[in-house]
Design a protein with these regions (language model features):
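N-terminal assembly/interaction segments in proteins that build large macromolecular machines
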Residues: 1-181
Length: 181
């Protein structure tokens, strides 16, 4: 009954976890969402998120994960059970999977931000590079992987910002377009 009463509530708090399998070739990021920061910081809730993320490593999509058996019931049923116990809507928000020759990850303190990267080849210091690159992604929040993923609107806005900076530096107006691009 509690779960039914909470179904329409917004679950915008929670934890985000990244996990990589033992041979570093597959990884997941999942978010376990709840309604309040108070619940998100609760040890039992964080431990549930850890167990769910460990279990999630065996799946490549959210639907099969939610339909899978977990601690004697389906994951989706476990979330409803926890909603009834905790008294807040509990749900899986994001579920992302990656497979690659090498996968690295980073989880920022507090379990609010995580990132995961995959390399097409494994190399000697891939572990360090994977962690460092994942950390930079988490810190910088990039809009795309490369220039092809950036919308024309964002490109135009950034060009205008660069042109304004160049004007302030006293660059000639007729050169601004070429310099900014």
């Amino acid at each position: 009954k509690v779960a039914a009463n909470r179904a329409d509530r917004e679950s915008s708090e929670g934890v985000v976890l990244a996990k990589v399998n033992s041979d570093n070739t597959s990884g997941i990021i999942i978010s376990l969402n709840c309604e309040t920061d108070f619940v998100a910081k609760n040890d039992d809730y964080v431990q549930l998120a850890q167990r769910l993320s460990d279990h999630a490593l065996g799946f490549t999509d959210k639907k099969s994960f939610l339909d899978s058996d977990f601690e004697g019931m389906k994951v989706s049923e476990k979330l409803l059970e926890q909603t009834g116990i905790i008294g807040e809507k509990i749900e899986i928000g994001s579920f992302e999977h990656i497979s690659a020759s090498f996968v690295g990850s980073y989880i920022h303190a507090g379990n609010k931000i995580a990132s995961i990267v995959g390399f097409s080849e494994n190399f000697d210091n891939a572990g360090d590079v994977g962690k460092d690159l994942s950390m930079q992604i988490a810190a910088m929040n990039p809009v795309a992987i490369d220039e092809n993923g950036v919308s024309q609107e964002i490109i135009a806005k950034e060009i205008e910002i660069a042109k304004d900076q160049l004007r302030q530096e006293g660059k000639p107006e007729e050169m601004l377009d070429n310099i900014a691009k």
